[in-house]
Amino acid sequence: MPVTHIRIENYKSIKRCDIDLNNITALIGANGTGKTNILEAINYFYSNLTENNISEMVFDANNKFSNQVKITLTFDLSNFVIISKTQINDFADLFDDNTEKSRHSEYFKSIIALVSSQKEKTISIQMSQIKGRGIQWSEPFQKRTILKSLFPFFYIDVRNLDINEWAEVWNVLGELSKVSNSERKTLEKQVRDIVENDIETANKVKAIREVFDSSKLSVVPETSKEFASSLSKIYFSGEKIQQKGRGLQYFSTGTNSVKYIELLLRAINEIARNKMKEPVVLIDEPEISLHPNFIDELADAIMVLDSKLKPIISTHSSRLIKRMLSFESVTLYNVKLENNYTVTNLMKRFQQYSPSSKYRVLDDHINSYFSKGILFVEGETELELFSNPYL
């Protein structure tokens, strides 16, 4: 699994939050309790992991004298260490070119070195930020770069989703279809050869180059992911996505939303299955605008993801939780406010009568997960009394 533990300290409404991520994790609770703050803290961690995207709006919202934010993620590299050791032993037979062999071998050695002193093959990275200062990291930039490559990050924020423009899909597909530097150079040479062998096309490209040169401007080369994304668009001869031969504007928000999320999840799943990566996935309120049947469809799409994927989901949907709880690999955390601070509590699942019998969980049972408390009563009189909305 990618991330095994998260600790957040003094981030907005969060004084201290510890979450273990052994399964698919669902955060449930009332509006305004801080579920999104938990996801945003992880997003903030990743957005600054190898870049500078510093904000002064991340500090304790309840205590102006609290001037330090800490976010710590623990990564499990056990699978990568096994793969790296195997690959190092096999490289002598795979590559005749010493440069290529050395480059790959050094990369795998650097992965092993990350956790060489750790028996459990995990590494904890802490981000610390003090008001008015920059961010300090517990590990150097090179190590963080490797971790970001091994554990790519995807944040599906459904509330701010543009369901008619699916630009983020191409970013994910770019990660899936990313090519090596040597493959990129080969493809670029093939394109140049095609252009140069056609006089008309070559003249057009020459004219474009002269336009940039005369303006004293240049084009910044794309990153590996951006290059792969552009390559995918060329292969499909476009980037606008349609459904059943119609543009996305034709369909309802709910229809587009569920298709968008499912497409992203399938692409991320292929990354986990086919590449040496274990993606970190956050999904914020995926049930927005969805018909109940679409919620069931979405829950099923989440639960069939590769076992290496352990998404963190924030939701208000009792139906989504009910559907997901039909599987064993789900952990629930209740999120609530106490003295204006976000508090998380691990919740227990409803027990089965026996290993051979399936307990029928009703909507009332699931709804109790979203309640502040549960009152057990005996008899119709007590039930009628405590069901009175005026009490």
Name each model-derived stretch.
Residues E40-H104:
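Conserved P-loop NTP-binding catalytic core
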Residues M1-S47, E51-N53, F236-N367, I374, ...:
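Switch/communication elements of ASCE P-loop NTPase nucleotide-binding domains
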Residues K85-K185:
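Electropositive, glycine-dotted interaction segments
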Residues N67-I71, K148-F153, F327-V330:
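Short glycine-/polar-rich loops that comprise or flank the Walker A/P-loop
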Residues K372-L391:
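Conserved helicase/translocase motor-coupling segment
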Residues E51-V58, K131-I146, G245, R319:
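Short alpha-helical segments and helix-capping/turn motifs at coil-helix boundaries
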Residues D162-V280:
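Extended helical coiled-coil dimerization/tether regions that scaffold
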Residues L77-V81, N160-I163, S317-L320, T381-E382:
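Conserved nucleotide-binding/hydrolysis micro-motifs of P-loop NTPases
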